[in-house]
């Protein structure tokens, strides 16, 4: 996420909220795949799409996780019960396996503030890059974000 950078407004929001965690969310576009804040087990928490129940329709959620968090460091000095997730991917036309924890699961354990951020323009907080081609196609947006000429990116 090239949009995530230190921002006094985000830090101020996090401190003012007195939450242990702040999770940044972005408006969801039709092609987006990712987690969203949902009420589960009596608490609003980030549920990644790989954890959605089989009959859940993700199109009903209008925001999703940017995978950008701010934490109060003292609240991370614990052992948290986090799930292990097995994900199959194709890398250079070969099947690869990724076994991972999801950082968003910390929202099940920590008081969390939810913050919807801009998704376009100079002040965007969310500019995801999944492939090298994404980087090339986002040249102008990156230049706008960082006040640089597009040919200098």
Show where each model-derived region lies:
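Catalytic core of tubulin tyrosine ligase-like
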Residues: 2-152
